[in-house]
């Protein structure tokens, strides 16, 4: 990571696709964001959006198979870009009116202005982008 304040700063973490790893990912990303995003509420929104993407990947893409996921974030003087890459299988779920499921994508789109999802036979890539300041 480049901490000089000039150029790109990078966060890169690979982890097993199991629920028990999600807390470690949130903790590591929170520490990285603390040095980059000055507005605490904006940093929390980013953290929550990434947490949703990772949780969706673990629960729906990998379904707890324990294979690896990768979170990579970059920040320059203008924005933060975060990419979550998995080798899981994308499944489209219909939202059921009386369940708590199916809100993760909507939540991500509410928290950060740019959410792009690409799926293929080899996995899913979720890209999030937001300005440094809210």
Each predicted region: which residue ranges?
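Conserved short strand/loop->alpha-helix "switch" segment adjacent to the catalytic nucleotide/phosphoryl-transfer site
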Residues: 26-51
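Conserved beta-strand-loop-beta-strand hairpin that lines the nucleotide-binding pocket
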Residues: 1-12, 16, 58-134
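Conserved polar catalytic motif of the HATPase_c/GHKL fold
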Residues: 52, 56
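Conserved catalytic/ATP-binding subdomain
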Residues: 20, 41-44, 67
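Heptad-repeat coiled-coil signal-transmission/dimerization helices
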Residues: 22-29, 108
């Amino acid at each position: 990571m480049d901490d000089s304040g000039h150029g790109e700063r990078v966060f890169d973490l690979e982890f097993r696709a199991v629920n028990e790893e999600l807390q470690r990912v949130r903790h590591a990303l929170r520490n990285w964001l603390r040095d980059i995003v000055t507005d605490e509420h904006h940093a929390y929104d980013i953290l929550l959006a990434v947490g949703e993407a990772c949780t969706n990947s673990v629960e729906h893409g990998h379904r707890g198979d324990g294979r690896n996921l990768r979170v990579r974030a970059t920040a320059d003087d203008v924005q933060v870009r975060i990419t979550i890459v998995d080798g899981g299988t994308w499944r489209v779920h219909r939202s059921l009116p009386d369940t708590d499921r199916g809100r993760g994508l909507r939540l991500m789109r509410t928290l950060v202005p740019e959410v792009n999802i690409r799926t293929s036979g080899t996995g899913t890539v979720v890209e999030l982008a937001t300005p440094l300041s809210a």
